[in-house]
């Protein structure tokens, strides 16, 4: 099998093969050039990344950190990888690409040479086998005619007996020419036969075999180029593998359990001798009736001691109950973390558990605080019980001898003194009954003192709510709340209403203490509790005093730990949307807000939750709650299993019956009629913003652009993204949104529904669609759309807003149409 034996008559195919191979080589050359450029850019990008790394992050502290060492080695090895990639790109350029360029030139020359030789031998073969023979045959026929003519004339001459010799001579001469030409023709024919045989048996096969040999040599060369390319560009070469091995080894050297051993050794301090807390005996120097470390039981304190003992007993029971609850919560959370750990597919998935682990540690701290409180109450109770039991059944001794002596006072003085002692006694009893009266508590102490509860558990802490929403909650003098800053996550702000203004104070964190401008505290609850109970001004300049803590709306507030994120469902305007599971195993949809979004977008994100809090309707997606205690903010919605309506229409277009399409339309009208009754303007009604729930119930969703206006009209100065083809003319031209503009969008939604998910105004750009609508054009009815439905669409698209129907009217019309449809 070969070119010479099998491709003698396949010249066109051979030429096409060469052309195709040349195009292929040019493509390979272009690809290699782009690969070189890409690798150089990649190497440069890696180097720039390493150069831009904050040098402070690689500077060692005065202790040995494996994390820092590992990070430094990662940077160094990344730089090494950059150098390797740059070298590879240069080798690729000087090696395979250069040789490929030479090979293309050689292949072009081979093609040119083959075509030239083939044309030459083919022309020679045609000349010998056709052209020359045709000439001889033509001359042959002519000489036969001349000989026959001479023969006839010779016969005539014989018959007449005139010029016989002359006629004979001409006859002989013509016969000789014919015979000579005949011999030439026979020889030429023999030569042509041999030439043709040589052409097909030797000459042409030799040329084709020569071409095949060069083709195969070039394939061999190309194979070598490919092999060199493969070796140079391989990402599993020893040097690259070593880079990643070094990185992996440095990562494996990180041991969380020993990471801080050296730090502890360097900064270890000797345990300071604890200060002895003893009774200050100097207090007794001017009084002989009181004894150090002794409970005084007498006629002035007996009653109050009983009250104190009872209060302590109650507080101890409450503390112990709270301790049990917290310990159970610790066990439950530990179990949840353990279960979640088993489902982690990647090592980095442990990050998803960090917030829960932090909550666990906070719970353990709460447990320890409760145990401390329990021990304190127990010791105090035992001290009181001992004193009360010692004197059980005895008459309390008097503190003062009221008998008159030589310097007795008058009866009036005695009454006044008795009155004063009674006042003192009742005052002492009152103080003991309500030792935390300054904090507004009627018990001896809270189970956990308010200031010791975590920030997230404080009623006045609202999490990462927007500034404008915080201001709406502050209405009276002294109203206050604490929130996390939207612009700077991790920074906390005190918002207060004072002297007709809403003031915002950043809570400073300096030297591990929280403060405004006065005393610092170890946590924010202690700081706020101090200013609230003492009525100390926040700053001297502002004169602001905290009077009324504004509690958060606990109905909607959830903690981040209350929901476990699952699979990614998609991406919204503000961040990712996940499937989530609540503690009670309820499946939900979790909308997240990117932490790096501008302040105004975060406000828009929470706007949806603020609106949905007020609504409860089967055709409106339901709000479960919000997680604003820390970043990132979550909005928890009901999980609607069917997904968005637009995708549903396109996916199920061959299955959906007409009656179901009308039902979807009726659901949408019902939901929008409810919103209309609440003066809510959706502003972005479209199939993509509706969801399909169980039993194919359609729900209106995506209230990110919605507004609730008492007048039913909202004017916008401009939106960054406007759904042009869905928006009413008055909204596009003047920024005037209303329920009537939502009705226009509803007409487009109907068109999407009955076209089974086709984009409105097909074939038109946004600008073309807008211009056509202004000229009076309206989209034609979708195929198989009922006439009654299209009439509704046309009503919705009336240019004048006041002429469009109300959603309540649309709901009634669609109800009637639904009853008529049977299929």
Swiss-Prot record:
Assigned keywords, A-Z: ATP-binding, Cell junction, Cell membrane, Cell projection, Coiled coil, Cytoplasm, Cytoskeleton, Kinase, Lipid-binding, Membrane, Nucleotide-binding, Nucleus, Phosphoprotein, Proto-oncogene, SH2 domain, Transferase, Tyrosine-protein kinase
GO BP terms in the entry: cell adhesion; chemotaxis; Fc-epsilon receptor signaling pathway
Modified residues (Phosphoserine): 434
Gene Ontology annotations for the cellular component aspect, listed alphabetically: anchoring junction; cell cortex; cell projection; cytoskeleton; nucleus; plasma membrane
Family: Belongs to the protein kinase superfamily. Tyr protein kinase family. Fes/fps subfamily.
General function of this protein: Tyrosine-protein kinase that acts downstream of cell surface receptors for growth factors and plays a role in the regulation of the actin cytoskeleton, microtubule assembly, lamellipodia formation, cell attachment and cell migration. Acts downstream of EGFR, PDGFRA and PDGFRB. Acts downstream of EGFR to promote activation of NF-kappa-B and cell proliferation. Acts downstream of the activated FCER1 receptor and plays a role in FCER1 (high affinity immunoglobulin epsilon receptor)-mediated signaling in mast cells. Plays a role in the regulation of mast cell degranulation.
Protein name listed in UniProt: Tyrosine-protein kinase Fer
Lineage: Eukaryota, Metazoa, Chordata, Craniata, Vertebrata
Gene (UniProt): FER
